[in-house]
Amino acid sequence: LIAAAVAIACLAASGGLSTVYAADTKEKQQQVEQQFRHLYRTIGEKSSTKIKLISGPEAIKMRNGRVPGKRWFATSGQFKFKLTIQDGVDLKVEKLIERLEKLPLPYVRAYEVVSDEKEDGIAVYKSLGGASAHGGKQYINIIPGAGPMVLAHEVGHTLEQKAKESDPEILDKWEAAIEADKVSISNYGDQVRHEDLGEFSKVYAACLDAGEAQLSKLRKLSPARFKLWESILNDGDLSAEDSEVLPRTKN
């Protein structure tokens, strides 16, 4: 009990979730991710995302550790972005593209966000110190074995940080959405609010790929997060009708 209290206190001090779901609650037993996990196995089967290489490979020094690698430029729809693979990694760029194409086209915007002049786009490293991936405004780094659901989670971090440029309160709004929904997404998401957002991004990607029936189910289970994530995903393009359902942040 003491350890649990300390953990909760640490979460609060670090800006973590203000709502902590006890292990024996109904919400915890019916976490949102558990209801859609079966979709992860088939994600991409209905994807219309197509990626085309337009140049490369070019020998470069990658951002993380200045290790040698190869870089390509690619396009998908209206998006243009970079693909970078560390030398010696057992992953062909064609296989990387197959993996990236499994995510719905709106998620490709994150690939472009991390492809500014001094950035590497989607970057594949031999190792990330034990992690499968890292995502932020300037990078999406993955290891060779990271699958599409890992990518979908990291896209959440990238687009959240991009949205924060125009809306510094975006994570406060997300926390308000968590409290309004009163449901846990996953154990990992319960740790801190930005990981909750990453986990929701992952679930939403699977539902978007699966079709309207699954999207509607997700919308009913977590309506506040759903509306806010669609705004983040579509670069703030949210209808007035949808904006009315978003929770207000506390003053």
Locate each region found by the language model.
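Bacterial N-terminal signal peptides
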Residues: 3-14
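Boundary at the C-terminal end of the N-terminal hydrophobic targeting segment
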Residues: 20-22
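Auxiliary, metal-adjacent structural segments of Zn-dependent hydrolase domains
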Residues: 35-137, 144
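Soluble non-cytosolic domains of exported or imported proteins
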Residues: 90-97, 145-150, 188-192, 219-220
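Structural recognition of the beta-strand scaffold that forms the well-ordered cores
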Residues: 123, 141, 160, 196-201
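Post-HEXXH active-site segment of zinc metalloproteases
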Residues: 145, 163-186
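Active-site recognition of the HExxH zinc-binding catalytic motif
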Residues: 149-164, 198
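Metalloprotease/metallohydrolase-associated module, dominated by Zn2+-dependent proteases
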Residues: 175-247
